[in-house]
Amino acid sequence: MITLQRTPLFDVYAKYGGKTIDFGGWELPVQFSSIKEEHEAVRTAAGLFDVSHMGEVEVTGADSLAFLQRVVTNDVSTLKVGGAQYTAMCYENGGTVDDLLIYKRGEEDYLLVINASNIEKDYEWLASHVIGDTKVVNVSNEIAQLAIQGPKAEGILQKVVSEDLKEIKFFKFKNDVLVDGIPALVSRTGYTGEDGFEIYCKSEDAIKIWEKLLEVGEEDSLKPCGLGARDTLRFEATLPLYGQELSKDITPIEAGIGFAVKTNKEADFFGKEVLKEYKENGAPRKLVGIEVIERGIPRTHYPVYVGEEKIGEVTSGTQSPTLKKSIGLALIDVKYAAIDTEVEIEIRKKRVKAVVVPTPFYKRSK
């Protein structure tokens, strides 16, 4: 029997009603109350997520910037201390190793946050391409990560920190913020389409912060949230999930994150030639939104057709809790990607009518 990995918060899941599942080798809560309730809490109030399964890698040394410029697609030279950047790592053929966040903690000190299912693969990829004076260290087991997301997230977190959180702008962070007296890196980032913060602390401090936030957030309807709501929230906001919208066979351009690919940066990086070609002349496939007109919910890998031609497949799909519609993301042949194009999805051996619609499906009002 495979032993599932657990985060430092595992022991408190049951106290809050957490129902765990095997998520890529991790025993994680899929929900605490219900996916729908948790989803709505984040859209209207706030939700607290344990995302400690995510990986963290420290990159330091005099050549750390040159190294990162070679292995990621975005332009890290534009990042200032206290800034965060979304980027991708690619293979030479343009396929995606992973998508990640980079935090610049010092002139020669970067923290990379990578997907849980890719920790070993990413670390080996990074370590195998180290240049000069660069040190790459996997610190995933030492760091826990919590995410507090939703319109009331700032107000709740503000109750337990002395720093003025309004000073931490979107995709910025502060190191050594005291959260209920515990030092943590606090960044204004997230994976839900809402305002919110991600909190990185020592693994042994995670339970104390989790319980304190739920205690002070109770009057503002803060709910503990699981992976189910995390997935429906990120999906509505059209944020890609590695293994579905991104993979070794899907480039960042096709997945709609071309903004994180800077082919005009001086540094040569893995996949640059292919990605430059796709950026300038278009990629053969495109990730599009689809709305099902008839009955049925599109799910990952369901084939998409126009007539008898298979034009691609669904990458993610659900009954949207916010929009109350059956919607999906699909990677399809670019010639069928125009808005309002009618397509068919094969759901349980039956063709169901759908139409290409704009994304993101959900965008919060400022």
From Swiss-Prot:
<comment type="function">
    <text>The glycine cleavage system catalyzes the degradation of glycine.</text>
</comment>
<dbReference type="Pfam" id="PF08669">
    <property type="entry name" value="GCV_T_C"/>
</dbReference>
<keyword id="KW-0032">Aminotransferase</keyword>
<dbReference type="InterPro" id="IPR013977">
    <property type="entry name" value="GCST_C"/>
</dbReference>
<protein>
    <recommendedName>
        <fullName>Aminomethyltransferase</fullName>
        <ecNumber>2.1.2.10</ecNumber>
    </recommendedName>
</protein>
<dbReference type="InterPro" id="IPR006223">
    <property type="entry name" value="GCS_T"/>
</dbReference>
<dbReference type="GO" id="GO:0008483">
    <property type="term" value="F:transaminase activity"/>
</dbReference>
<comment type="subunit">
    <text>The glycine cleavage system is composed of four proteins: P, T, L and H.</text>
</comment>
<dbReference type="GO" id="GO:0005829">
    <property type="term" value="C:cytosol"/>
</dbReference>
<dbReference type="InterPro" id="IPR022903">
    <property type="entry name" value="GCS_T_bac"/>
</dbReference>
<dbReference type="InterPro" id="IPR006222">
    <property type="entry name" value="GCV_T_N"/>
</dbReference>
<dbReference type="InterPro" id="IPR028896">
    <property type="entry name" value="GcvT/YgfZ/DmdA"/>
</dbReference>
<comment type="similarity">
    <text>Belongs to the GcvT family.</text>
</comment>
<dbReference type="InterPro" id="IPR027266">
    <property type="entry name" value="TrmE/GcvT_dom1"/>
</dbReference>
<dbReference type="GO" id="GO:0004047">
    <property type="term" value="F:aminomethyltransferase activity"/>
</dbReference>
<dbReference type="GO" id="GO:0005960">
    <property type="term" value="C:glycine cleavage complex"/>
</dbReference>
<keyword id="KW-0808">Transferase</keyword>
<dbReference type="GO" id="GO:0019464">
    <property type="term" value="P:glycine decarboxylation via glycine cleavage system"/>
</dbReference>
<dbReference type="Pfam" id="PF01571">
    <property type="entry name" value="GCV_T"/>
</dbReference>
<dbReference type="InterPro" id="IPR029043">
    <property type="entry name" value="GcvT/YgfZ_C"/>
</dbReference>
